[in-house]
């Protein structure tokens, strides 16, 4: 990304400092800015609740509720009895922590009260804080927004914090933590330094091009640096979809002819009865979706109608939707009945779905299909699954669970390929906003390469650097910032 409170007259420690909206203290004039407070831990009954404040009146709030003459030692917990500032009524015994700015999460004076988590206790403490002059309830994400405004977090780190709060799988947690730790921000800063150096050299050549003291090959070095940066940006843009899948979930679609066991597999993978299982063909007639954690990766698992011709109008609409969903899938689990591979529906699925997908995976260098032969328990011990040549496949029995471990391992490999491994490699682009600004930077570098006018070349470099600045939060519009901070709860 391109404190203070005046002295207050305190009462003796034995008596609580009584400051509230209806107490005549004149303390409002001592508070230069707004101070916010909120419950930071989860709603509902719990063992411990954390209530925090941020702003110049945090010290006043601390003294008002605890009767302390001075704040306790910074970042050290002390046990105090909390009293209402107006009535002096005891509220709870609390651990009190004091974080003076700028060495705090928001960069402002902050206080945390760790109280018992009963709803009445939390409500009473929040009401007491609301009676202190200069304090108001925080808005959603306002603590984090203040941290951003004071340079404690870049915008990509803010997004990483939001993703960490909402992470539901191990892969999401790892990716969010890397982004919160600033890896994406640091990568962008490195690119920005390259552009700044290139821009300085171009402008130096414009100003001192005829000067003998200017080193030779300055523009040639700029050109090499910009081309190397273009390669790096292009590589990250190619991986952008992987990061978005990791954040939102990969689309895994189960498809196949009727009665192949698709619904049984969906129920097994999701570990809950998502789909109705019946021996009658055509039971599933619409797309059934469920979010699943598979091998630590977020997945949107879809059950689809059995693919066959000649069914009724309603089932044919389900087949049409199933084929449409196949086009949107990241990974397709193609299911066949291992005991009925010679049927017309199985042969049709192999010809119309499996064969094109196998050819496509060879062309793209990435496998998108896992072919599964279900009902392996119905095969005799010495009989092959089929006399016909099949693409690589896995034998599976949803009835006995045989082959599930091999399927989960294969899925883990495929998910790592389409989502990326959050533990290794460069940080991923997890949002469309990241992709937009990186593409804008790359477009500006393309204009730099095409122009022969040094002034236009310098302007192209400025535009490229500006796009990187927007990515990390520099010069961002209020509308975009509002959307990002709306993802946070009130106490964050």
From Swiss-Prot:
Q: Which free-text remark accompanies the cofactor?
A: Forms a homodimer in the presence of potassium.
UniProt record, GO biological process: mitochondrial tRNA wobble uridine modification; tRNA methylation; tRNA wobble uridine modification
Residues bound to 5,10-methylenetetrahydrofolate are: 52, 112, 152, 492
Any Pfam family: TrmE_N
Question: Per UniProt, where does GTP bind?
Answer: 256-263, 282-286, 303-306, 374-377
- Per UniProt, K(+) binds at 259
Q: Which NCBIfam families match?
A: mnmE_trmE_thdF, PRK05291.1-3, small_GTP
Which named protein is this? 5-taurinomethyluridine-[tRNA] synthase subunit GTPB3, mitochondrial
Protein species of origin: Rattus norvegicus (Rat)
């Amino acid at each position: 990304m391109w404190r203070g409170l005046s002295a207050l007259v305190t009462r003796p420690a034995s008596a609580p400092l009584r400051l509230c909206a209806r107490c005549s203290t004149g303390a409002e004039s001592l508070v230069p800015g707004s101070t916010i407070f909120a419950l930071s831990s989860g709603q509902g009954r719990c063992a411990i609740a954390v209530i925090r404040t941020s702003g110049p009146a945090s010290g006043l709030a601390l003294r008002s509720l605890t009767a302390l003459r001075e704040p306790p030692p910074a970042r050290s917990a002390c046990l105090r009895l909390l009293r209402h500032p107006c009535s002096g009524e005891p509220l709870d015994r609390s651990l009190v922590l004091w974080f003076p700015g700028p060495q705090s999460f928001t960069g402002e004076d902050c206080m945390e009260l760790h109280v018992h988590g009963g709803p009445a206790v939390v409500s009473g403490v929040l009401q007491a804080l609301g009676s202190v002059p200069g304090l108001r309830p925080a808005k959603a994400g306002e603590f984090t927004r203040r941290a951003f405004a004071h340079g404690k977090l870049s915008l990509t780190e803010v997004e990483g914090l939001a993703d960490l709060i909402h992470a539901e799988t191990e892969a999401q947690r790892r990716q969010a933590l890397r982004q919160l730790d600033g890896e994406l921000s640091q990568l962008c800063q490195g690119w920005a330094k390259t552009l700044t150096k290139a821009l300085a050299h171009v402008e130096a050549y414009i100003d001192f091009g005829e000067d003998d003291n200017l080193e030779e090959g300055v523009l040639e070095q700029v050109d090499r640096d910009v081309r190397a940066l273009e390669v790096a940006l292009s590589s990250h843009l190619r991986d952008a979809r992987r990061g978005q899948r990791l954040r939102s979930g990969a689309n895994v679609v189960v498809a196949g002819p009727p009665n192949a066991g698709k619904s049984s597999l969906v129920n097994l993978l999701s570990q809950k009865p998502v789909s109705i299982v019946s021996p009658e063909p055509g039971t599933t007639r619409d797309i059934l979706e469920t979010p699943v954690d598979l091998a630590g990766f977020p997945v949107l698992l879809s059950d689809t109608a059995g693919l066959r011709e000649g069914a009724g109008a309603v089932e044919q609409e389900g087949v049409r939707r199933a084929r449409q969903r196949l086009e949107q899938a990241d990974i397709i689990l193609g299911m066949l009945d291992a005991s009925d591979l010679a049927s017309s529906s199985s042969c049709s699925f192999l010809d119309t779905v499996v064969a094109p997908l196998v050819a496509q995976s060879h062309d793209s260098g990435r496998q998108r299909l896992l072919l599964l032969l279900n009902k392996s328990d119905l095969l005799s011990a010495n009989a092959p699954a089929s006399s016909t040549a099949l693409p690589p496949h896995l034998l599976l029995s949803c009835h006995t669970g045989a082959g599930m471990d091999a399927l989960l391992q294969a899925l883990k490999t495929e998910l790592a390929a389409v989502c990326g491994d959050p533990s290794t490699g460069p940080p991923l682009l997890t949002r469309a906003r990241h992709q937009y600004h990186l593409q804008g930077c790359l477009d500006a570098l393309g204009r730099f390469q095409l122009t022969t006018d040094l002034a236009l070349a310098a302007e192209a470099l400025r535009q490229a650097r500006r796009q990187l600045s927007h990515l990390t939060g520099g010069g961002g519009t209020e509308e975009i910032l509002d959307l990002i901070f709306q993802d946070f709860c009130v106490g964050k």
